[in-house]
Amino acid sequence: MKNKTYNRKKAMVVFFCAVLLISALFGRLVYLMIFDAAHYQKLAKDLHERERKIKAARGEIVDRNGVVLATNRTVCTISVIHNQIKDPEQVIAVLCQELGEEEENIRKKVEKVSSMEKIKTNVEKETGDRIRNLDLAGVKVDEDFKRYYPYDTFASRVLGFTGGDNQGIIGLEVKYEEVLKGTDGTILTVTDARGVELEKVAEDRIEPVAGNTLQISLDHNIQKYCEQAAKKVHEEKQADSVSVLLMNPQDGEIFAMVNTPEFNLNTPFELIDVDENTEQTDEQTQEMLNQMWRNPCINDTYEPGSTFKIITASACLEEGVVSLSDTFSCPGYRIVEDRKIRCHKVGGHGQETFIQGIQNSCNPVFIDIGLRLGAEKFYAYFKQFGLLSLTNIDLPGEAGTIMHNVEDIGLVELATISFGQSFQVTPVQMATTVSSLVNGGYRVTPHFGVAVLEKDGTEIRKLKYKKKNGIVSEKTSETMRILLKSVVEEGSGKNGYIEGYSIGGKTATSQTLPRSANKYISSFIGFAPAEDPQVLGIVVIRNPQGIYYGGTIAAPVLRSIYDNVLPYLGIEKN
C-alpha cells in the first residue's frame, strides 16, 4: 500500500513536470510565431537571399565649354558561386584562357567554399560578354564602370585618377569625391538551401543613382596651348620640369595648369622616364609613383627670386616709404652688416630712379626699400597679402609658405627677402598674390570647380569662393600695373612683349639650395591687358641647361602662349 502511494506521487511529479515543459515549449512557440515572427522571417529571408551590388556610374568632369575630360567605360566583374558550379575544370580552363590569369590563382578561387568569390574586376566588356555567352554554371558576369580619360595625359595632375574601387585618389577626382560618386544599387536573388539561385523567381532590384557632373574652369584649348609651349621649352632646355599656370585675376578661375612631364591617366601606375632594365624595390617604385603624381604648382615650394619684387614694391608703395621719383645708386652690390650682396649686373646700374630700378630688376634698390620698410612691417604685409596662409585652391595637398619667424629676421635676412630669396612659396601662391596686387587690391581664391550639373547639363548649383578686399589700395594697384607694363616694354621683361598688346610682367632667376649645386629656376609672371588684367600667367622652369635667365627663356614661353590665348579670349589688339 505504501509503495502504491509512493508510485502515485512519483507519477504526479513526472506528469506536472511534463505539463510544465510542454506549456513552456508551447508558450515559446506562440511567442516565436506571433511576437517574434518578423525577426525570424527576416533571418529566413536573409538565408535564402543573395545581395549583389550594382555600381553607380561616376559623374563626368567637363571643361568650361562642356568638353568631356573624364568619363566612364563599361567593364565587367567576373565572380563564381561555388555551390552552382557543375564542371569546375571547364570553368578553370575558360577563365584562365579569357582572363590571362595563372591557373593556380583561378583554381584557388573556384574551389573555395564561399557564397560568392570575385575572380577579377575591370575586365574589358568584350571579354565579359564572351564569358557570359558561354553560359557556364556558377559563373557570374556583372557590369561595372571604369574611369576613362579621353585625352590620356591631359592635365593629369589636375584631374587626378581613381582606384580599383572607382574612388578618387588624387586631384579633382578626390577633392570632389562627394559630387562625382553616385549611390550604388542592389540586386536581391532568392536561393535554395544549397545556395543555388532559383530561376523564374522575381528579383528585388534597387537601381543605382549616377554621380553628378563637375564643370571646371579649365579650358581644353588653352590647356593644350600651354602644354605645347611647356613641352617645347622642357625639351629644348633639358629641364627637370616646367610648370605653367594661367588664371583670371579678377575671379580666380584657372584656365590652365601644366606640369611637365605629364603622365597617362589611363595607366597611372606606369612610371614615366624610367629605365626598364633598372630594378627597384616595391618601396622605391611607390616613392617614384608618389613623385610622379605630385603637382609642383601647388605641392612644391621654391625661392621666387625677382618676381617677388612685385610684392616688395607694392608693400613699400602702400606704406609710403618709396615714391616713383626716388633715386638710388647701384655700384653692383650692397653691404649689409658683414655681407656683400651683389646685383646681377656686376658693374652696377649707377644712378637710377625707382622706376628704372624695377625695370632693371636691381637688387640694391630693393634692398634699400626693404630696409626702409623694416622687418615688422614687411612681415605684416606678408600677412595682409595672404602669403602666410594657404590659397585654399580646390586641389589636395597644397604646401604653405616657408618663412622666417619675424623675430628671426635680421638685416641680412630682410635684405634677401626683399628681392625674393631666403624663403619659399608655391607657384599658385605667387600667381594668386600678384593677382591681388594688379586687380585693384582684392584677393581671390584660385579654383577649378565652377558648377555641379545634372547628367543632361542642367545646373544644380554654382560653386562659390571667398574674396578678401583691402589687400592694397586701388592707387597702389594702378601704379603697379603701370610699373610692370614698363618692365615688359622697356626693361628686363622685353621678351614677353607682343606688339599690339599691353602686357605687364616681371622676370626672375633664382638659385636652388644648396647654392653649390649651381642649379637655377627661371620664371616669369605676366598679365594682360595691363590696364585691366583678364588673364595672368606664371611660367616656372626648373634646372634648365645652358642659358638659364628668366627673361631669356621663361618670358618667351608666356609670350608664345599669349600669342594664341589673348585672341582666343577675345582680347583685341590696340
Predicted regions located by residue number:
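Beta-lactam-recognizing serine transpeptidase/beta-lactamase-like catalytic domain environment
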Residues: 68-70, 192-203, 244, 249-307, ...
